[in-house]
Amino acid sequence: MTNIRKTHPLMKILNNAFIDLPTPSNISSWWNFGSLLGLCLIMQILTGLFLAMHYTPDTSTAFSSVAHICRDVNYGWIIRYLHANGASMFFICLYTHIGRSLYYGSHTSQETWNIGVLLLLMVMATAFVGYVLPWGQMSFWGATVITNLLSAIPYIGNTLVEWIWGGFSVDKATLTRFFTFHFILPFIITALVAVHLLFLHETGSNNPTGIPSNMDTIPFHPYYTIKDILGALLLILTLLTVTLFTPDLLGDPDNYTPANPLNTPAHIKPEWYFLFAYTILRSIPNKLGGVLALLLSILILLFIPMLQTSKQRSMMFRPLSQLLFWTLIADFLILTWIGGQPVEHPYITVGQLASILYFLLILVLMPVASLIENKLLKW
């Protein structure tokens, strides 16, 4: 008798995606982050759903409703902090996933890569509107500052900002629509994840060598299901440790003060996962220039497949490119650090140099290094 998982229309799809999927036999733990991102998404949707049952998207009660969740709702505090720190874990996995794809040349699968970049943008949008919901000081001023950047667009800027706000300032209408977006976006992300996987399974997974592995594959289950479960356990352990011991480690103390339009916090800054882009924005003294650089700092990922000049897919056997890749990672960390510092000397200069290096590495140095490596290998 034929196995039901191979004949049933629905089971067949799941079987071909998670059970009998031919997978390269040599993929390392860096390939775990895709499944971890799926786990993060599920956790965020579930915790978010329970939070939405008790949250009220109204300027007069939003802050109190979050306090009510933490104080009065059964296990509300852990749901709230799992959701807040879950977002941080989500971005750690996202950035690692992107870094792995860059290192091993996964961006040569262009459709998968482009949908991945779109997913990154949507997760960033979701995190931004979500940060506004507790209606603390940093929520309010973060929303004001970031939405205000759109006013740099010539001709339509101011109208666009007022349209997004639903008035002449960040107020009740803004909070309501941000809650709506925060609720709907994760479901759109889930649909895009399915498309991301669809395109990935068209070509099959890449592997550390970057060489086609069609002749050396093993079934996904049980080998990689076990490996993914180990990764999932480590992720959950880390998340629970942070949530139970230092829940506010990655948050901002200013957000425990209710939003006050008459009092600006000393240092307005976003959550840690946006700090690298925030530094690039601050590094340019011109408003429109800063906004364009901010956009380009993320959209530059779309140009990476076009900048692939190496004849080898992976960086595994390319020491020069490896050096530049790790320089890029260090630069990303420096940008993140600078974003959390006040706008004063020497942070301004360091931020500007790190911003220049960021674009220089991706657009010039890495493609040139690849060409040099081609020459050295007489390719």
UniProtKB/Swiss-Prot annotation:
What the entry lists under PROSITE patterns is as follows: CYTB_CTER (PS51003), CYTB_NTER (PS51002)
- Residues involved in a ubiquinone binding: H201
Per the entry, the cofactor note is:
Binds 2 heme b groups non-covalently.
The membrane topology of this protein is: Multi-pass membrane protein
Q: Where in the cell is it found?
A: Mitochondrion inner membrane
Q: Which GO terms describe its biological process?
A: mitochondrial electron transport, ubiquinol to cytochrome c
Q: Which keywords appear in this protein's UniProt record, sorted alphabetically?
A: Electron transport, Heme, Iron, Membrane, Metal-binding, Mitochondrion, Mitochondrion inner membrane, Respiratory chain, Transmembrane, Transmembrane helix, Transport, Ubiquinone
Which parts of the sequence bind heme b b566? H97, H196
Give a GO cellular-component term: mitochondrial inner membrane
Membrane spanning residue stretches = 33-53, 77-98, 113-133, 178-198, 226-246, 288-308, 320-340, 347-367
A Gene Ontology molecular function term of the record: metal ion binding
Q: Where is it mostly found?
A: mitochondrion
Superkingdom of the organism of origin: Eukaryota
**Family named by the database record:** Belongs to the cytochrome b family.
Summarizing the function annotation, the protein's role is: Component of the ubiquinol-cytochrome c reductase complex (complex III or cytochrome b-c1 complex) that is part of the mitochondrial respiratory chain. The b-c1 complex mediates electron transfer from ubiquinol to cytochrome c. Contributes to the generation of a proton gradient across the mitochondrial membrane that is then used for ATP synthesis.
Protein name per the record: Cytochrome b
Q: What gene makes this protein?
A: MT-CYB
